[in-house]
C-alpha cells in the first residue's frame, strides 16, 4: 500500500513537473553599450512543443544593487508564474528580466536611463526589445507588451511607460524610485556611479513628467493601465503617493495599493502575484 502511494506521488510529481515553465539565461550583444548584456527569460509550459505559438511579453526590471538573476532567485519567478498560469490568474506569457546593474555599485553601471557612457534606454528599445521578441515569439505590439519592476526598476518601468506609452498596455510599479533630490555629491577619488544613477533618476523624474505633461501627452498616458504598489513603511512611500495624486489631478486613471510592508522581498513576493494578473487582464 505504501509503495503504491509513493508511486502515485511520484507520478503526480512528474505530471506537475512536465507542465512547468522554465527560466533560461540568455544574452544579447549590444552595440549601443559595447558589451554583452545578460537576461533571464521565463517561457511557459508548451513553449517548445508549439513552435508557432505567440505570447504576450512582460519586461520585469530589477532594483538597485541587484542584477538579472534577482527575480529568478529571490523572486522565485518560475514558481510564481507557473502557479498563476495554472490557476488561470495569469495568461501564458514570456517574462524578460534584463540586467541593468549589480552589487558593486560604485564601479558597475546601474540604471535604466541614458547617462554619459551608459545609454541603457537606447539599448533597451533599439536592441533588447526587438531581438528578444523575435527570438521568443513574444510581444510585437502595445497590446501584447507590459513593463513592471521594483525600486529602481519600478521607476524605470514607470518612465518607460510614460515616454513610450505607444509600446506598453500596462505598467506595474512596485516601491518605485521615482525621483531623487539631486543633492547627492560625487564621491571624490573614485568612479562614483552611484552619483550618476542618482542624478539620472532626478533628471528623468516620473513626477516631473506628469507635472509638465501637455494635453497630448496626457492623452497618451491615459492609453496605459497604471498600478502603483508601495508599502506603508517604505522610505519611498511619499513619492509613490505623490505620483498617484499627480495623475489623479490630470485625470489619468491609476490603481494605488498601500499595504503593510517595507522595501524588501517580503513585500515584492506579494506584489508580483498581483502584478502578473494585472498585466494579463490588460493585454489585448
Please give the residue ranges for each predicted region.
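Absolute protein N-terminus
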Residues: 1, 20-21
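Non-catalytic cap/lid and distal C-terminal segments of serine-dependent acyl enzymes
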Residues: 21-284
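Sec-dependent signal peptide recognition
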Residues: 2-11
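Hydrophobic h-region of N-terminal signal peptides that target proteins for export
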Residues: 10-19
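Compositionally biased, low-complexity segments enriched in small residues
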Residues: 1-2, 154
Amino acid at each position: 500500500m505504501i509503495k503504491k502511494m509513493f508511486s502515485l506521488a511520484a507520478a503526480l510529481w512528474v505530471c506537475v513537473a512536465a507542465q512547468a515553465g522554465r527560466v533560461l539565461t540568455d544574452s544579447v550583444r549590444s552595440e549601443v553599450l559595447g558589451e554583452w548584456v545578460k537576461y533571464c527569460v521565463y517561457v511557459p509550459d508548451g513553449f517548445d512543443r508549439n513552435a508557432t505559438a505567440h505570447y504576450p511579453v512582460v519586461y520585469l526590471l530589477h532594483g538597485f544593487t541587484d542584477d538579472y538573476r534577482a527575480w529568478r532567485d529571490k523572486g522565485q519567478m518560475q514558481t510564481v508564474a507557473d502557479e498563476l498560469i495554472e490557476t488561470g490568474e495569469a495568461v501564458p506569457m514570456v517574462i524578460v528580466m534584463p540586467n541593468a546593474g549589480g552589487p558593486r555599485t560604485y564601479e558597475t553601471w546601474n540604471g535604466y536611463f541614458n547617462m554619459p557612457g551608459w545609454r541603457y534606454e537606447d539599448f533597451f528599445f533599439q536592441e533588447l526589445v526587438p531581438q528578444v521578441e523575435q527570438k521568443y515569439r513574444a510581444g510585437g505590439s502595445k497590446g501584447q507588451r507590459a513593463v513592471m519592476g521594483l525600486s529602481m526598476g519600478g521607476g524605470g518601468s514607470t518612465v518607460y511607460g510614460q515616454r513610450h506609452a505607444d509600446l506598453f498596455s500596462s505598467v506595474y510599479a512596485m516601491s518605485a524610485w521615482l525621483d531623487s533630490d539631486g543633492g547627492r555629491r560625487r564621491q571624490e577619488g573614485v568612479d562614483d556611479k552611484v552619483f550618476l544613477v542618482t542624478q539620472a533618476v532626478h533628471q528623468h523624474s516620473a513626477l516631473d513628467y506628469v507635472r509638465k505633461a501637455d494635453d497630448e501627452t496626457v492623452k497618451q498616458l491615459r492609453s496605459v493601465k497604471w498600478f502603483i504598489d508601495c508599502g506603508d513603511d517604505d522610505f519611498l512611500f511619499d513619492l509613490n503617493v505623490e505620483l498617484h495624486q499627480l495623475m489623479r489631478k490630470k485625470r489619468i486613471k491609476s490603481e494605488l495599493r498601500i499595504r503593510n510592508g517595507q522595501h524588501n522581498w517580503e513585500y515584492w513576493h506579494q506584489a508580483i502575484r498581483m502584478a502578473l494578473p494585472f498585466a494579463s487582464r490588460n493585454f489585448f
